[in-house]
């Protein structure tokens, strides 16, 4: 298994990571706004499906190391980005799903799943991220590069490592998903 996304269908990308457990240790990184803000986006999340919430993205805060953002993301990185979302599923500590996008665009959907990986004594968690209802290939390429970088940060955080600068990780996949999805 490599760390790249797969495309189960043309409107879905999926990532799998094996993280150090137990599941109860990983769940706060998904649901708790402060912990989620360490690798993805901060913001309090409701517990009742159908309720809306806001997430705040600030990629330069995900690591003590800094790297300049790519030109197309300079303004977003400087000011941060806010997204309005709707909770779709809240099933602690195994499943969390929400809309992804903003009110000016369509909404796609993101699902996080946590499952025991292998023998329980090995204390490993299978984290599956499925991003569905993706409208087109360009959007799939864009979100795949972002998720790839965010998940690398999550992997490091859960392993007790200091992650590299977000934009350095993102740059390593620049162009990779465009090639992978052109097949």
Label the predicted regions:
Residues 12-16, 52, 80-82, 95, ...:
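Intrinsic-disorder/low-complexity, polar/charged segments enriched in Ser/Thr/Lys/Arg/Asp/Glu/Gln
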Residues 23-24, 46-49, 88-93, 114-126:
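A short, structured loop/turn motif at beta-sheet edges
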Residues 1-52:
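Hydrophobic ligand-binding cavity/cleft-lining segments
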Residues 17, 43, 82-89, 101, ...:
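Hydrophobic/aromatic beta-strand elements that line small-molecule binding cavities or substrate pockets
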Residues 99-156:
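Beta-strand/loop substructures that line and gate deep hydrophobic ligand-binding cavities in soluble
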Residues 45-99:
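Glycine-rich portal/gate segments that line the openings of hydrophobic small-molecule binding cavities
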Residues 26, 36, 53, 87, ...:
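Hydrophobic pocket/interface hotspot
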Residues 158-183:
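Short, highly charged C-terminal tails/helix-capping segments
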């Amino acid at each position: 298994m490599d760390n790249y996304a797969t495309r189960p269908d043309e409107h879905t990308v999926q990532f799998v990571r094996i993280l150090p457990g137990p599941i109860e240790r990983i769940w706060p990184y998904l649901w708790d706004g402060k912990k989620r803000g360490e690798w993805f986006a901060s913001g309090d999340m409701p517990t009742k499906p159908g309720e809306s919430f806001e997430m705040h993205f600030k990629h330069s805060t995900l690591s003590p190391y800094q790297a300049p953002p790519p030109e197309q993301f300079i303004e977003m990185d400087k000011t941060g980005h806010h997204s309005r979302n709707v909770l779709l599923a809240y099933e602690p500590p195994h499943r969390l799903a929400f809309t992804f996008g903003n009110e000016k665009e369509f909404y796609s959907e993101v699902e996080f799943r946590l499952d025991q990986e292998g023998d329980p004594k090995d204390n490993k968690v299978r984290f599956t991220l499925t991003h569905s209802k993706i409208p087109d290939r360009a959007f799939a390429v864009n979100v795949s590069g972002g998720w790839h970088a965010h998940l690398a940060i999550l992997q490091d955080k859960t392993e007790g490592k200091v992650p590299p600068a977000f934009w350095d990780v993102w740059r390593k996949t620049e162009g990779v998903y465009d090639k992978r999805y052109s097949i």
